[in-house]
Amino acid sequence: MDPIDAEIIKILQDDGRASNAGIESKLMVSEGTVRRRLKKLVEDEFIQIIALPDPRKMGYESQALLGVQVEPDKIGDVANNLSNLGEVNWVAITTGTYDVFAWVTLPSAEALGLFLRNDVGSIPGVRKTETFVNLDKMRGHAITI
C-alpha cells in the first residue's frame, strides 16, 4: 500500500459511495488507476466494501459487550463458537479479566437475556460472563489512515 492507496481509503471513509470518477478528480490520477487500485485493495483484504446499517433503525434495540471468562484450553473454541452466532458482530480474544469479548446486537432486552442463557450459556468452556449493555452510542468510526 502506498500514499495513493491510503488517499483512496480516506476518501471512501468519508463517502463510502464515492465514484471512481470522483476519486480520480480528487487524486489527479486516471479512473482506470483508481479502479485497479481499489480492486487490489479489496482482493488483498486491506479494505472491505460493505453497508453498515443502523441497528436501531433496523429494529435492534439492544446492543451489548460481553466479557467472557473461559477455561484456558477452550479459549479458541469459545471464540469460534461465538463468532458463528448471528447475533454476534465481532469477537476478540483478549488479555485481562476476560478471555474473550463479543459485541452483540439483538431486538430487545428480552432477546438478549434469552441469547445469554440459551446460546452463550450452552457453549462448552464458558465459565462466566458479564454483560455491558450499551445505553448510548457516542462515536463510532474506523481507524484513521
Regions found by a protein language model. Name each.
Residues M1-I145:
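A compositional/biophysical signature of low hydrophobicity enriched in polar/charged and small residues
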